[in-house]
Every structure is written in structure tokens, then in C-alpha cells.
Design a protein with these regions (language model features):
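N-terminal secretory signal peptides that target proteins for export/translocation
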Residues: 1-13
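Bacterial N-terminal signal peptides
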Residues: 16-28
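Non-globular disordered terminal and juxtamembrane segments underlying protein topogenesis/assembly
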Residues: 186-188
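Sec/Tat signal peptide C-region and signal peptidase I cleavage site
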Residues: 30-34
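Extended interaction regions within the primary functional domain
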Residues: 7, 24, 35
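Structured extracytoplasmic
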Residues: 35-182, 191-196, 201-219, 226-235, ...
Length: 273
């Protein structure tokens, strides 16, 4: 911001608490108090994976993520963005936009804005990088092709709601000019070997080249997924961060929901997150 087939019954039993946690997180922003912390959660067990080496684990979950990315291109969904600035505990401005998202036969994304209110954000304005975060990084899927640009380091195992997960640190190998990357952590479900949670930010932050050019500071976000037709699709992301602009700071909260997934051919409507 500037200035394979899965048994549905088992799915329901297995992800019930995880989905409940997502639903609880989607209450109005005034009820969200803790700032985003990628280190929060249960005890991190640094024991190596038992059934395979770390390298094999990485290869397998990247292959699954590649399938998720390909599958998601065959769905339409709604992207609902709410950004708020706060003065103490009081909301003093917001930006709200709802967009219908679809993809053509070549995987090219098409956006149709169905609701957009006049922004009243205080102390900040939405930048192109903010919209990149919403479109690309909050619902980020780490495919085999993308992984060539990153160093993935095994961090351990952690219980997330009712799921057992493997945790990886993800850092770009290099930062090429005019390109943006994800930096943070991903949580990989130990059974399905797909990402179920991620936390981090997009990098690099834009360097101010001119004296009067506004600073662009990237907030830390956390994103969650839910099983949609057998794949873990992005459904929710949030930001609760205090952004520092020189000597000034702005408290920002953000909720992004990706919901109403349905197949593009209309043959089957997926359950809403």
C-alpha cells in the first residue's frame, strides 16, 4: 500500500474444524484484534518426515499444487475485498469491492466488478501492488514451475486446527527487476500433500526513487484454503498490520474472500466456503 478421488464423508469429518476456523475468521473486522503473525500456532515439531525424504516430499506437494492450479482455472468465483484503516479501535475509512472472476480456455483471467464503493481510506491508498497481492499472492499456488524461483526449507511439522501439516519456509532465490515474489511460510497437509495455509508478504517493497514519491509498504497476510471438489482452493485471506511510512504509521485490516466456486461449464456447483 502506498502512503486422486477422495471420499466425501471422510472429507467432511476431516476438515470440519478447519472450515469452522475459517468461518469464525470471517466475522466483521471489528472482532479481529490480533495482528498477523506468521509464527503463531501450535508447537512446531522439527522432526524430519518419516515416510519420505524432504526432497521427495517437496516434489510430491509441488506436483499436487500444479494440479490445483490447473483445476482452479476451470472455475468461476467471487472475490470480495474489504480494506479498513483504524484510528485506535475505531474504523475511520474503508475500501470495498466485489468482483466476479473467470478464466478463458487459455487460462487468461477476466474480472467483472459488480460492486465498488467510493474509497474513504485514511493515510493510505490502494496501489497496483495491493491489487497484485489480492489477485496473485493471497491465493498463491506454488507450482513446480514457480518453485524453480524459490528456496524451500523444511521447518517442521505442526498441527493446524484438525490437520497435521508440514511447514516450509519459502524465500525467492533472486529478485529480478520488475518482478514480485512471495516470501513467508506454507503449511502442507500431510495426507493430501496440498497447501492448506500460507503466511507472508510480497517482495520486494518498492523503493522510492524521487523525494516526493509515496512510499509503498507491503502488509503481511495469512491465507487459508478449503476442499472444493477434492482440491484445496484458496477461500480466505486477512491482513491486520501496522504499516510504517517514515515517522507515520497506519493500522490496516483487510479481509479477502474467494467464494461461490462453480465449474465454468455449469455442470456442477461447488459448495460455498
Amino acid at each position: 500500500m502506498s502512503a486422486g478421488a477422495i471420499d466425501e464423508k471422510n472429507i467432511c469429518q476431516r476438515v470440519g474444524l478447519f472450515v469452522l476456523a475459517i468461518v469464525m475468521l470471517t466475522f466483521p473486522l471489528r472482532n479481529v484484534q490480533a495482528q498477523t503473525d506468521c509464527g503463531e500456532g501450535g508447537t512446531l515439531d522439527m522432526t524430519p518426515p518419516k515416510e519420505m525424504t524432504t526432497d521427495v516430499l517437496i516434489q510430491k506437494f509441488l506436483a499436487q499444487e500444479t494440479k490445483v492450479q490447473a483445476a482452479r482455472l476451470h472455475y468461476q468465483y467471487t472475490q470480495d475485498v474489504l480494506v479498513q484503516t483504524l484510528d485506535g479501535k475505531t474504523v475511520d475509512g474503508q475500501f470495498h469491492q466485489v468482483t466476479e472472476v473467470s478464466y478463458d480456455d487459455r487460462g487468461k483471467r477476466a474480472d467483472k466488478v459488480t460492486f465498488s464503493e467510493q474509497p474513504t481510506l485514511r493515510g493510505i491508498q490502494m496501489s497496483s501492488e495491493d491489487f497484485d497481492d489480492i489477485r496473485e499472492f493471497m491465493p498463491w499456488v506454488l507450482t513446480t514451475e514457480q518453485a524453480a524461483q524459490y528456496n524451500l526449507t523444511y521447518a517442521g511439522q505442526q498441527h493446524v486446527d484438525d490437520l497435521d501439516t508440514y511447514v516450509f519456509h519459502v524465500v525467492p532465490k533472486t529478485e529480478e527487476k520488475n518482478k514480485r515474489y512471495f516470501e513467508g511460510r506454507v503449511w502442507v497437509d500431510s495426507r493430501d500433500l496440498q497447501v492448506v495455509k500460507l503466511c507472508g508478504k510480497s517482495v520486494p517493497e518498492t523503493v522510492r526513487k524521487k523525494k516526493n514519491e509515496p512510499l509503498d509498504v507491503r502488509p503481511t497476510f495469512v491465507g487459508y484454503r478449503q476442499i472444493i471438489d477434492g482440491n484445496w482452493f484458496p477461500v480466505y485471506a486477512r491482513v491486520d498490520d501496522t504499516l510504517q511510512f517514515g515517522t507515520a504509521s497506519v493500522h490496516v485490516r483487510e479481509i479477502v474472500k474467494f467464494n461461490g466456486y462453480k465449474r465454468a461449464d455449469g455442470s456442477q456447483v461447488a459448495p460455498k466456503p
